[in-house]
Amino acid sequence: MKGFSDISRGFTLIELLVIILIIGILAELALPDYQRAVEVSRVGAALAYSRAFRDSVDRYYMAHNRFPTSPDVLDIGLTECPKYFECRYGYLATEGKLEMWRKNGPFEYGLFTRPTVSPYMPGTIYCIASRKKAQGIEFCQHWGEEDSSPDEPTWFSVLVQ
């Protein structure tokens, strides 16, 4: 007859719980880095859109001596904002500015693009985050040094290019 110790070759409940705990800790440490890497790739697509938009607004301004009133009149056929972003054109006719806000993301931030012919901060693209949202600020810091005044209570901005 075989002994009792020869039959039990599995893991105990405590050993399984320790393994699950270790996997959970590793996943918690890796998840923010994964989310940041995904956001960086999404911003890459948004930056390409921003540059194309900026160049198109510049061409429109050179041809008509004014900013476009709608993105529909631009020469590059921008029909949709990049996936995961919401485009706002409220200042397009007055400043030629494009605002893209990240929607439903792990943290909040926006990209502001100004054409080269703009009298205010010409040709710049900024990453903007609320000072109340630490994750958005950390994400914008990935792109460069803070460019806003530390006394500005609402917005934190970083010059992307």
Task: Outline where the language-model segments fall.
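N-terminal hydrophobic targeting signals that begin at the initiator methionine
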Residues: M1-K2
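N-terminal single-pass transmembrane signal-anchor helix
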Residues: D6-V38
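Generic detector of bulky aromatic hydrophobic side chains
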Residues: G10, L47-S50, R54, Y84-C87, ...
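Alpha-helix termini
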Residues: I23, A37-V40, G77-L78, E95
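Alpha-helical protein-protein interaction elements
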Residues: L26, A52-F53, Q135, D147
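Conserved hydrophobic/amphipathic alpha-helical signal-anchor segments
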Residues: E28, P32, R36-L74
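Periplasmic/extracellular, small/polar-rich flexible segments of pilin-like filament-forming proteins
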Residues: H64-Q161
